[in-house]
Amino acid sequence: MKIGIIGAGAAGMVAAINVANENNEVFILEHTSKIGSKIRISGNGKCNLTNESVSKEKYNNQDFADVVLNEFSVNDTKQFFYNCGLMLKDKNGYYYPMSEQAASVIDVLQSELYKRNVKLITDFHITRMHRKDDKFIIKGNNKEIIADKLIIATGGKSAAKTGSDGSGYSYAKMFGHNIIEQV
């Protein structure tokens, strides 16, 4: 199966690592020139990966948060990075890479993508997407790429200079999804 992922941030790379196996051909499309741009600046460049105080009570939609946190817990997050070869440092319940450098996180994620033969395509600017005969057709950079499954992992509008410019909302709309406006 050919699986396409739009966005090479933390969510896109982790999704690719989780679905890449001998049965799946996985590619990531990133519209900037670098992967993990927002990771590089998170935690003032130290990249806080998770913390022990994560709970559903800290979210507006507690039912949804409960489902998500039960599916992939703080311990699951720590184990994921350990399995990728990243040693973590606990600072009062907040977890950082041992190096305290966000670049370490990007390096281990990129290494895992390479081990799993995930194809990274940077500077790819999507102009159109649609679904035809159970396939996803993605057009951009004078190319057409076809996928059996598609994951949109573009982030929100939090940091346009890193690539989180809200483009994922328009991509989701192309497939008929409703977008709930931010408050």
Residues of each region from the PLM?
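Residue-level detector of alpha-helix initiation sites
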Residues: 5, 9-10, 34, 156-158
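Glycine-rich active-site loop/strand segments that organize a redox cofactor
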Residues: 44-92
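Short beta-strand to alpha-helix junction loop
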Residues: 65-73, 92-111, 157-164
